[in-house]
């Protein structure tokens, strides 16, 4: 028996891909990473990964964490930039004996040295939304944030092991 749950509708396609893995006896760790990568790669989610909204300076800074329920290992990145899949970096960091949480430039440098894909995460769509928001701020005509935020995934595999992951464009 296996199981999986994720936050928000935006994770649906990733959960379906991960479901195939779990049905094929894959590990919960692979399932969590697969599900979250699907969300990170989709350019129309403005709160996670590629297409996520940039910060005040126009830079897409992302956060991700990965936790292994069997070993209690954790890996995390915060403020990472120009990396295609922060969840994959966080997962690899969970296997590091020391310094399993990297922030900002240190997170990005770790990812580049480890061979992760460098990618400009700012899409034209996200840039336009950001520019509109800057104009609203200047005009003091603000509305509450519209949309969902961080994606979170929990998976249990057929070996009764559990893993958890989360990703956000901060």
Report the location of each language-model feature.
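Alpha/propeptide regions of enzymes that mature by internal proteolysis
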Residues: 1-170
